Swiss-Prot record:
It catalyses: ATP + H2O + cellular proteinSide 1 = ADP + phosphate + cellular proteinSide 2. This is Protein translocase subunit SecA. Pfam families: P-loop_SecA, SecA_DEAD, SecA_PP_bind, SecA_SW. Monomer and homodimer. Part of the essential Sec protein translocation apparatus which comprises SecA, SecYEG and auxiliary proteins SecDF. Other proteins may also be involved. It comes from the Bacteria.
Length: 869
């Protein structure tokens, strides 16, 4: 085992040394020369020209680019990138996951890879977990980017579409994972190019995901969903169920008997389809006072009426479905005869059957668009990630995202002391021990951070600390900006802070407090300007250096007084003094109140202490009533406590126990990874389908008129070939062809074929017959184009394609949801649920595409002039 571990560390070390040799040393060699460059923006733009016009790769210009970015950091924000930060920036550029300890300056490291990748002119995204961190990153690093001539955008929750367009058009954009994901989904529901907010040409080029383990592992299974209320149409299903009772079933046209179909609709039992006749269309329009049934505003109504007829004529109670005691329509498996609870017909058919039966129609939000973070970030041309804890999850990053983890060396050695766990019999015994430890530490003035796994635990501990008379702050990840403010000061002497695991993530805890943070907040509150303006930044930096020029710089800020400046100078002195005091006391002490299922989360909590070479310590308190211990701890440990006669207040402290806990965590991590990987396999089926639909939409939205016309003609030809394959198959004798149904179906879609002699097809060679009908349909399309004019036809085609694709995709998503939920209930015996899901999902998708092409054909040939406007 140790040999394997050594091999892992050797590989990491070799990679680091390679970057030192090929990047760090050459960048350092350029430093003196770069400091002499007066206009960094001009120099950086010359690199942009080399990449965009000269054909050089980003790797070709990496060294001079990093040298310029480092110098921009020094000049603009007073922060020069350390050598280890250059290593981190290189890893991010390479599309790797960079593991960097807390306090190592991830925000600054990201500027290297973001600015470098922005040279391609395709945009670079910094993705973080909340609006507050996105704003701080964009504003704090904005000066650096602007010094290089790069534009910086920020996306926040409350922005309007035009503001989002401007932000995404910038060279570098800071955005939260949820806003980015939802913008992507909304763009794929847009009805015109002008509605797109992401770049039209290459929306997802390069991204760095901050706190990458949180987004791509902890939130990996949480899908982003845009939904709309489906209940609006519920009453209409009942209306149409009554309407179709007033329609008459007819017979299709039949040579020698009828030249036209009779009745209001005809039935195709073989294909389980219904077809409205001209008489039926006119009757529906009259009964509903609709005008044209095939006008844009009536598209959904035409679809729902067709489904109501199918429900009435083709789906029968006790054969295709039952109505159970709860009044639910439950499908019967046609092969086994068993009911399939949880399964629903797609595309509105199930609701139509519910309306026919007079039972309650299921009210639910209709999914309009959805994607998981796992599949979303894999759409990027290249993405990287950074976090304090990633190595324990490297297998998952590699298997799912193809990204390895590079552990970046710390700038200064880590000297934090991590004690073995203390294990108690009961949870309350553990909490009492935590309070005693806090009392003792607090008496010395040492700052303490208590990490909890839940809000409930933090409130319990808070109540116990109040009883003990210990003042403290409680954080539970509800208020992002206030949270950062409190966590930034958690390193001051005498401070006790309770925080849930994720609270304040992304904000450093500095011993003695964070003077820059306090001063920045005071400037914003007192003078109404951002702490990131050049004037405020210069003043804050001068205070931090204890520079006498701080007085002159401060008085340049409108409204600032000498009294405020003196208070700022005193604050800096107090914090420096307090920092030394806290260091002498041993630094920040971390108390973990239980072990998390993931070692990574525990390591994140520990990593709060010991930043940048500071002293610090950590210890976890565990009880046998904790979930992890209850489910996974060895019975031997419990038995040992019993043998020793230990009571609730006596702990075990032994490496054996700590090791047992970590082995339990590794087992849980493996299990959770397996679950995520299995779910991803299911998601990948949907992902491939989504890629096809979104590519089709994008082609319609952004393509030329010629592209759209070609797509439309292709769909019409596909629909025609589909009908021919079904009713006049080449491999069957012509005498057996069902030309009557072929005629009915084709006339419903292409009424311009009313004079076409379908019976004549029987007397041609099969291939010639197919070609003849296809040519007739192509002629009908040309006639339609001549009738409407090319411009009007293309407007109509774009509109119809988008509307039809969106309607069918929305209904398909619902069907996929139902399939996913019901797949485990299907009694497949020894058959693999995933194989069955993939098979059924593929069939559903193919059916949807066929129906989509049929609807496009129908609307293109039937819609009246002016209705698409």
């Amino acid at each position: 085992m140790f040999r394997v571990l050594n091999k892992v560390f050797d590989t990491n070390q070799r990679d680091v040394q390679r970057i030192v040799k090929t990047v760090v040393q050459p960048v350092n060699a350029l430093e003196e020369e770069t400091m002499k460059i007066e206009n960094l923006a001009e120099a950086f733009m010359r690199l942009r020209q080399r990449v965009q016009e000269g054909g050089e790769s980003l790797d070709d210009v990496l060294v001079p680019a990093f040298a310029l970015i480092r110098e921009a950091g020094r000049r603009a924000i007073g922060k020069r990138h350390y050598d280890v930060q250059l290593i981190g920036g290189t890893a991010l550029h390479q599309g790797r996951i960079a593991e960097m300890r807390t306090g190592e300056g991830k925000t600054l490291v990201a500027t290297l890879a973001l600015a470098l990748n922005a040279l391609e002119g395709k945009g670079a995204h910094l993705v973080t977990v909340n609006d507050y961190l996105a704003r701080v990153g964009a504003e704090e690093m904005g000066l650096l980017y602007r010094t290089l001539g790069l534009s910086v955008g920020l996306i926040t929750r409350d922005m309007q579409p035009h503001q989002r367009q401007a932000a995404y058009a910038c060279d570098i954009t800071y955005v939260t994972n949820s806003e980015l994901g939802f913008d992507y989904l909304r763009d794929n529901m847009a009805q015109s190019r002008e509605q797109l907010v992401l770049r039209a040409d290459n929306p997802l080029h390069y991204a760095i995901v901050d706190e990458v383990d949180s987004i791509l592992i902890d939130e990996a299974r949480t899908p982003l969903i845009i939904s709309g209320a489906a209940e609006k149409a519920t009453d209409l299903y009942y209306v149409y169920a009554k309407l179709v009772k007033r329609l008459q079933r007819g017979e299709p046209a039949e040579p020698g008997k009828r030249t036209e179909p009779t009745g209001d609709y005809t039935i195709d039992e073989k294909g389980k389809q219904v077809h409205l006749t001209e008489q039926g269309i006119a009757k529906i329009e009259r009964l509903l006072s609709l005008g044209d049934l095939y006008s844009p505003e009536n598209m959904d109504k035409a679809h729902m009426i067709t489904q109501a007829i199918r429900a009435r004529e083709l789906y029968h109670r006790e054969k295709d479905y039952i109505v159970n005691a709860e009044g639910e329509v439950v499908i019967i498996d046609e092969f086994t005869g068993r009911s399939m609870p949880g399964r629903r017909y797609g595309e509105g058919l199930h609701q139509a059957i519910e309306a026919k039966e007079g039972v309650k129609i299921e009210n639910e939000n209709q999914t309009l668009a959805t994607i998981t973070y796992q599949n979303f970030f894999r759409l990027y041309d290249k993405f990287a990630g950074m976090t304090g804890t990633a190595k324990t999850e490297e297998k998952e990053f590699l298997d799912i995202y193809g990204s390895d983890v590079l552990v970046i060396p710390t700038n200064k050695p880590v000297i934090r002391q991590d004690a073995d766990d203390l294990v108690y019999r009961t949870r309350m015994g553990k909490y009492q021990a935590v309070v005693e430890e806090v009392k003792q530490m607090h008496a010395t003035g040492r700052p303490i951070l208590i990490g909890t796994a839940s809000i409930d635990t933090s409130e319990q501990l808070s109540a116990l600390l109040k009883q003990a008379g210990i003042r403290h702050s409680v954080l539970n990840a509800k208020y992002e900006a206030q949270e950062a403010s409190i966590i930034a000061q958690a390193g001051r002497s005498g401070t006790v802070t309770i925080a849930t695991n994720m609270a304040g993530r992304g904000t450093d805890i500095m011993l003695g407090g964070n003077a820059e943070f306090i001063l920045g907040e005071a400037i914003e509150q007192n003078f109404g300007i951002s702490r990131f303006t050049p004037e405020a930044e210069a003043f804050i930096k001068a205070i931090g250096r204890e520079d006498p020029e701080a007085v002159t710089l401060g008085l340049r800020i409108p409204g600032m007084t000498e009294q405020f400046i003196r208070q700022a100078q005193q604050l800096q002195k107090d914090i420096i003094a307090d920092r030394e005091r806290v260091r002498e006391l041993g630094g920040l002490h971390i108390i973990g109140t239980e072990r998390h299922e993931s070692r990574r989360i525990d390591n994140q909590l520990r990593g709060r202490a010991g930043r940048q070479g500071d002293p610090g310590s950590s210890r976890f308190y565990v009880s046998f009533e904790d979930d992890l211990m209850r489910l996974f701890a060895s019975d031997r440990v419990v038995a040992m406590m019993d043998r020793l006669g230990m009571d609730d207040t006596q702990p075990i402290e032994a490496k054996m126990v700590t090791g047992a806990i970590e082995r339990a965590q590794a087992r849980v991590e493996d299990r959770n990874f397996g679950i995520r990987k299995q779910l991803l396999e299911f998601d990948n089926v949907m992902s491939k389908q989504r890629d096809i639909i979104y590519a089709q939409r994008r082609e319609v939205l952004l393509g030329t008129d010629e592209d759209v016309e070609e797509s439309t003609e292709g769909m019409i030809a596909d629909f025609t070939e589909m009908q021919l394959a079904f009713y006049a198959p080449i491999d069957q004798p012509a005498e057996s062809w069902d030309l009557e149904t072929l005629r009915t179906n084709m006339l419903e879609a292409v009424p311009q074929l009313e004079h076409y002699d379908f019976e004549a097809l029987r007397h041609m060679a099969p291939e010639a017959a197919h070609a003849h009908l296809l040519e007739a349909v192509a002629d009908a399309f040309d006639a339609r184009k001549a009738e409407l004019g090319p411009t009007m036809l293309n407007s109509l085609a774009r509109y119809v394609l988008l509307q039809v694709v969106d309607q069918h995709w929305k209904e398909h998503l619902h069907g996929m949801d139902v399939l996913r939920q019901g797949i485990g209930l299907r009694g497949y015996g020894q058959r693999d649920p995933f194989t069955e899901y993939k098979f059924e999902a593929t069939n559903m998708f193919n059916d949807m595409i066929d129906n989509l092409k049929a609807d496009v054909t129908k609307f293109i040939f039937r819609m009246q002039f002016g209705q698409a406007s």
